[in-house]
Amino acid sequence: MPCLLPTLLRATRAALLLQSPRVVAAPASQRLLSAPAQPAASPSSMDSAEELLAPLRLAVRQQGDFVRKLKEDKAPQVDVDRAVAELKARKRVLEAKELALQPKDDIVDRAKMEDTLKRRFFYDQAFAIYGGVSGLYDFGPVGCALKNNIIQTWRQHFIQEEQILEIDCTMLTPEPVLKTSGHVDKFADFMVKDVKNGECFRADHLLKAHLQKLMSDKKCSAEKKSEMESVLAQLDNYGQQELADLFVNYNVKSPTTGNDLSPPVPFNLMFQTFIGPGGNMPGYLRPETAQGIFLNFKRLLEFNQGKLPFAAAQIGNSFRNEISPRSGLIRVREFTMAEIEHFVDPTEKDHPKFPSVADLYLYLYSAKAQVTGQSARKMRLGDAVEQGVINNSVLGYFIGRIYLYLTKVGISPDKLRFRQHMENEMAHYACDCWDAESKTSYGWIEIVGCADRSCYDLSCHARATKVPLVAEKPLKEPKTVNVVQFEPNKGAVGKAYKKDAKLVLEYLGACDECYITEMELLLSEKGEFTIETEGKTFQLTKDMVSVKRFQKTLHVEEVVPSVIEPSFGLGRIMYTILEHTFHVREGDEQRTFFSFPAVVAPFKCSVLPLSQNQEFMPFVKELSEALTRNGVSHKVDDSSGSIGRRYARTDEIGVAFGITIDFDTVNKTPHTATLRDRDSMRQIRAEVSELPSVVRDLANGNITWADVEARYPLFEGQETGKKETVEE
């Protein structure tokens, strides 16, 4: 297959140069204007693959240098934004090529996997007998058990290990809360609508599908194809009017009816409702679980005897009214989240348990690596914190714990990386942000976010409610501190806002240092800033307010905690586990299985009588009761069919181990049975009375299968390879 990506790069750059010839891309002497097309590298040739990637890496590095220079020269923001858009386009091209060059055996057979998931009812589209609703899914017995085990392991790994305070908040959220958090104003995508039947589409997704269809037409010229490739490369960067122009230029119609479409409009992704019968209290289904934790900060602080640091967590469903859900569990309208908010003194971001994860080696994709065209590299976590790649050891500790959790539940370490947000991606209040990303058949997808959110959330809610959300820190010795506060000109504020002046003054009096510093910067740059309180907006200028800095002596210090927030998308984690653990038995393409770690396997063990002979039934009953007493979830399969066929059935739903009762169990004393390992298909023989505790210890991770094989004799009977496989 010919390499079209250098062409895509040139086309992207050309389109952007038309918008801003001065600053979009690096100077011509530093650009790759004619990188030759080359055949794709064979999976066995890493050198050949790197040759293909080298010019793309160079293109990213040069543009990253150019963006940095623009910022150093204090170029106009519009020029910086355009140059950053070009940088992101080059990054996407590089990453697409990296994924295209991965070995074929590294890619899961998604069609075969999805067939297994549907056939064994892991999950299915909700309301299927009514035609289904996109973006909503029901979990079947196997999927429900797998999801619950993923959640239970999360609880043990984080809440119990870290002694985190778990809470459970309502999903219904009044509008003012989400207005304060920014969700009402900013939580939106652009949408277009069929003008005749009202069918809605997400604008960027529809434009992408339409352009790809045009490009696949044999009559499409190379020039036109390059133009459309450049549009696709910067699709995430278009605003409302730019999208509207593109829909007109490319004559985009409804894909289902061919009707005209409305211009793109912002669509808020939250589900709106009204609380109470009067309809006077608008609200929303929560888009995240975090806000409930922030609002209960004071109560949680009291519960923790007023001490920092402490952490709170919540597991629950959140809702986003996606315009066009797709990609199975990756983009849905209702999903389960698990979020931790770790509250810490901003001046003491050192975690006492960081040494326990400091020696972990994991793939880190730093912001610097991204703007210089490098790939993620394996790095010791302790070195990453010491060298400042990761901002502080609290953030580093949670990244390490996240890595251990994800690999524990079945995500491949080689398909897991932590990507740092680039400066233009991070919210203005964030200190550092890293996403855990997994490689799937859909490419790299975010499954966990881990951000140092500074003091932003608590400060916002404190200003809106005029309730101080702070912790008191006793000082060993009195100290003199610098104080920053607003100094309002009451006369000017009163003249401008009259009866609302009191609202403005109260708001300014409740602001913390973080916010004041941000607004001070706006005052110096623009001469004004805007505040919002009790549903009203006020513009304040230099003659109305200034910033006063002075010193005072304190015996007790008030601290607005910084927040480290790990946020887990459990549906995406579950989907990644499904892909990373799906296998086809060597030599038998029809025999598939999931190699779930025992800790999350839907059933830890199966109990399988060799046949339906009634002599086996007392032992089936005895083992089932003993497994239940040991807390081992299990499945009894006493159906007809060969033992090999039943092994295949239990393997297909990821049952970790299998106990088989045969005639030796009945006829010999002491009574013994076989225990089979799903992944290796090897078996041992042990006394029936011992097996439940052995399976329990395997499921809890106290022992490994290697330990079991060292302790008990191997058995080779029920599954002897080729003959049994043929029978199945």
From Swiss-Prot:
The UniProt entry's GO biological process terms, in alphabetical order, are:
diadenosine tetraphosphate biosynthetic process; glycyl-tRNA aminoacylation; mitochondrial glycyl-tRNA aminoacylation; tRNA aminoacylation for protein translation
Q: Which Pfam families match?
A: HGTP_anticodon, tRNA-synt_2b, WHEP-TRS
Residues bearing the modification N6-acetyllysine: K193, K490
Known EC number: 6.1.1.14, 2.7.7.-
Q: Which residues carry this modification: Phosphotyrosine?
A: Y442
Q: Please give an example of a GO cellular component term from this record.
A: mitochondrion
Query: Per the record's keyword annotation, is Mitochondrion included, yes or no?
Result: yes
Residues modified as Phosphoserine are S689
Q: Which reaction does it catalyse?
A: tRNA(Gly) + glycine + ATP = glycyl-tRNA(Gly) + AMP + diphosphate; 2 ATP + H(+) = P(1),P(4)-bis(5'-adenosyl) tetraphosphate + diphosphate
Q: Which GO terms describe its molecular function?
A: ATP binding; ATP:ATP adenylyltransferase activity; bis(5'-nucleosyl)-tetraphosphatase (asymmetrical) activity; glycine-tRNA ligase activity; identical protein binding; protein dimerization activity
Domain WHEP-TRS residue range list: 52-108
Quaternary structure annotation from Swiss-Prot or TrEMBL: Homodimer.
Sum up the protein's function in the record's words: Catalyzes the ATP-dependent ligation of glycine to the 3'-end of its cognate tRNA, via the formation of an aminoacyl-adenylate intermediate (Gly-AMP). Also produces diadenosine tetraphosphate (Ap4A), a universal pleiotropic signaling molecule needed for cell regulation pathways, by direct condensation of 2 ATPs. Thereby, may play a special role in Ap4A homeostasis.
The protein in question is named Glycine--tRNA ligase
* Organism the protein comes from: Rattus norvegicus (Rat)
Query: What broad taxonomic lineage does this protein's source fall under?
Result: Eukaryota, Metazoa, Chordata, Craniata, Vertebrata
